[in-house]
Amino acid sequence: SMVLNKKYNVSFSRETVEKVEKAAKELGYVLPKRRSAKNSKNSRLIVVFCPTLTNPYYVMLLQGIESVAKEKGYGVFTCNTQRELKIEEQYLRMMPSVAPAGIIYTCNPSSAFMGQVEEIAEKIPLVIISNRERVRVDAINQDNTKVGSLMARHLLDLGHRKVAFIAPPLTKRQQQRSRRVEGFVKEYEKEGLADAVIIKAADDIWDEVLPSIDSEYRIGYNLTRELLSERRDVTAIAGLNDMIAFGIIDALQEEKLKVPGDVSVIGCDNIIFSRMSHMSLTTIEHFVPLKGRDACDIIMRKIESAHSAYSETQPTSIYHIEYEPKLIVRKTTGYARQKK
């Protein structure tokens, strides 16, 4: 490595150099292209890590990111990890040689790579749109416990005392999902209704296969069908996100149950389809496109700071931004039906 990279602070005999170069040629080794400091400053590429592109939530984040990048004359390259550790690791290994102007994670990095992510962040501006507390990098935070609590409080205020929460797999890798469920359950526990919430989560296999365009919709649909085959006393169902909520609604309507007359439904994310008049889904707004814009804004500030004539004397800032979630009441929630 030192021979091929022509390290200035070490020396080797001509014979050694020739042997190494000959071996490298025979093996087909190609020395990675190096960027000079000058060229690296001219990089106009922002890399975005996404776990999936099948949920409009991530498309909304990308729109926010791209709107700022375009304004500033930057391009955006999306790395779809498909929630697979191997793919995420491959992309991370590419980052030093790609040397983008900035990197944005639209979800929590896998804990196995957090050290690597923090190391990259020391050299390249990097922002995480996350729910992980105490990350040592710039982050757009979201309190998912508060989101779950807000969903539960709305249903409690409408008199729902037997409810279900439907979610994708609640694994250690997806802690933001678990926190949303925990916030929901704790709100019911405060009212002495610890046994009022039924949690139905998809099997872990859902996160291990390549997601299809309707994966989360099918989780909502399938688990609601399963729930209805087991019991009919539930008066409200919460979906971890809006796509799951759409599946819940279709499963209920297939069983001739009215929404919200028989069963209320609430989602989260306020994606574009939730606002359409025929759907009109009650949901939680947490300002997804603005999070994307903020993440890209932070990258731009870091780039400008690094290019400043006074960059060596400026303090290093870590940005943490959080939006307060907001309940959006529409037509899929109503007062709990009375027992007959």
Region locations from a protein language model:
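Short beta-strand elements in bilobed, periplasmic/extracellular small-molecule ligand-binding domains
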Residues: A69-N80, V185-Y217
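Flexible loop/turn connectors
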Residues: Y221-K340
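Central regulatory/effector-binding core of bacterial HTH transcription factors
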Residues: S67-S111
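N-terminal helix-turn-helix/winged-helix DNA-binding helices
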Residues: A24-Y57, L61-Q63, K72, M95-S97
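An alpha-beta-alpha
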Residues: M151-L193, I198, T313-T332
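Flexible loop/hinge segments that line or gate small-molecule binding clefts
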Residues: T106-L150, I166-T171, M243, D269-L281
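Short beta-strand segments enriched in small/hydrophobic residues
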Residues: S1, K38-T54, H154, K162-L170
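Hydrophobic alpha-helical segments within soluble ligand-binding/sensing domains
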Residues: I140-I166, E182, K186, Y217-E226, ...
